[in-house]
From Swiss-Prot:
GO terms for cellular component: plasma membrane; proton-transporting ATP synthase complex. Produces ATP from ADP in the presence of a proton gradient across the membrane. Residues 93-113 are annotated as: Disordered. Belongs to the ATPase epsilon chain family. Residues 93-104 have a biased composition (Basic and acidic residues). Keywords: ATP synthesis, Cell inner membrane, Cell membrane, CF(1), Hydrogen ion transport, Ion transport, Membrane, Transport. Its main location: membrane. Disulfide bonds: none annotated. InterPro entries: ATP_F1_dsu/esu_C_sf, ATP_synth_F1_dsu/esu, ATP_synth_F1_dsu/esu_N, ATPsynth_dsu/esu_N. It is a peripheral membrane protein. It comes from Francisella philomiragia subsp. philomiragia (strain ATCC 25017 / CCUG 19701 / FSC 153 / O#319-036). Coiled coil: none annotated. This is ATP synthase epsilon chain.
Length: 145
């Protein structure tokens, strides 16, 4: 029997930024963690900034996504994002600095509501980059991280 793979496409405003096949795609949607395999029921979900793991056989591509929307059909996963980076291209020091800057901005007592929302978004994105880096190294992260 021939093994069936999901088609996976990650699309940004620049076009397709990742194409591949997968046994399983793991990501966090609006309802929580999801593992999507061939034959999955159709769904549409929002995605927070986070990690997408695309596993085919023994290889896993670890991707950072800035947030977006995932569309699932029984044979395909399409993820629409503003930004995507492969974990191996992320810089740990830069992500840690971005996280520290965002945390500092959140402590500013004179910050406007808009500034606080922007800093919160930057903090979520920096945390997601760090999670992607850790995931690519085989390090565990939890929902609380």
């Amino acid at each position: 029997m021939t093994k069936k793979y999901l088609k996976v496409d990650v699309v940004s405003p620049l076009g397709s930024v990742f194409k591949g096949e997968a046994d399983i795609v793991s990501l966090r949607g609006s309802a929580g963690e999801m593992g999507i395999a061939y034959g999955h029921t159709e769904l549409l979900s929002t995605l927070p900034a986070g990690v997408v793991n695309v596993r085919k056989d023994e290889h896993t591509d670890v991707l950072y996504v800035s947030g977006g929307i995932v569309e699932v059909t029984p044979t395909r996963v399409t993820i629409m994002v503003d930004d995507m980076e492969r974990a191996e291209n992320l810089n740990q020091a830069e992500a840690e600095k971005a996280r520290a800057r965002a945390q500092e901005a959140l402590k500013n007592p004179d910050a406007s509501k808009l500034d606080i929302e922007a800093a919160s978004k930057r903090l979520s994105e920096a945390d997601a980059r760090l999670k992607a880096l850790n995931s690519s190294k085989g390090l565990y992260y939890s929902k609380e991280d």
